[in-house]
């Protein structure tokens, strides 16, 4: 985790805590003590002082993940969400407490840099949707694209939108149950760190998945061997414009 509470219950970012490592900090979810980890192997982060199973949030900590989160105010990062223990939905959730990477304007934004199972992907979507939140996933696909595992075949367009058609060698099983027509779960693939046309070189370039072979229509599991994207939104500015307008 990259943020924690100080003794006055104020949110503190890891960059600030590194300068004051002897201060006490606490997990925003379980309220147990955490310590500053600032070594040479992993990116700087907070970790529980004693082993705790309140969350396995640190599984996807990376510089890429961190840079995305820093685009948002600290109050919107790593927001703890809970399901009411008396809610019947709890029977279908693996966890009753989760830490959203970002929560803003009614959207949960999850940044995924490492492999994730279809079970975990589905469970997070179910959890957040049941709390009335739409979920925006941003997956780091830069290596997949650069190594030509994901190949751009051609473009498509109509009167309302345009985008790309792709072929994916050895497609991930993460999305096997994903419904590409689900308006409450938005899937975005980042294909490059920088767009050649982009003045802000910190934004990167991505595309929103709008179609994949779908189990609801094709009587088989969702198959990302072939999928289509929209070119809009294509960067952080356009994404936030969509989110603020609640148009995703």
Report residues per predicted region.
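Non-catalytic C-terminal interaction segments of nucleic acid-processing enzymes
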Residues: 1-22, 26, 145-248
């Amino acid at each position: 985790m990259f943020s924690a509470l100080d003794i006055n219950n104020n949110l503190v970012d890891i960059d600030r805590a590194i300068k004051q490592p002897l201060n006490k900090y606490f997990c925003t979810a379980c309220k147990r003590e955490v310590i500053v980890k600032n070594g040479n192997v992993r990116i700087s982060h907070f970790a529980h002082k004693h082993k705790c199973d309140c969350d396995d949030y640190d599984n996807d900590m990376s510089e890429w993940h961190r840079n995305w989160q820093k685009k948002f105010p600290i109050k919107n990062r790593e927001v703890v969400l809970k399901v009411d223990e008396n809610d019947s939905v709890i029977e279908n959730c693996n966890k009753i407490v989760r830490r959203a990477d970002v929560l803003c304007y009614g959207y949960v934004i999850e940044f995924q840099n490492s492999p994730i199972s279809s079970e975990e992907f589905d469970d997070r979507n179910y959890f957040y949707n049941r709390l009335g939140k739409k979920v925006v996933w941003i997956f780091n696909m830069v290596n997949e694209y650069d190594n030509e595992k994901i190949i751009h075949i051609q473009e498509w367009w109509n009167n309302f939108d345009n985008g790309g058609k792709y072929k994916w060698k050895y497609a991930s099983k993460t999305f096997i149950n994903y419904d590409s027509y689900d308006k409450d779960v938005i899937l975005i693939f980042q294909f490059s760190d920088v767009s050649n046309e982009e003045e802000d070189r910190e934004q990167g370039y991505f595309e929103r998945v709008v179609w994949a072979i779908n189990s609801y229509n094709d009587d088989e599991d969702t198959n990302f061997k072939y999928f289509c994207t929209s070119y809009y939104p294509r960067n952080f500015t356009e994404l936030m414009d969509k989110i603020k307008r609640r148009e995703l």
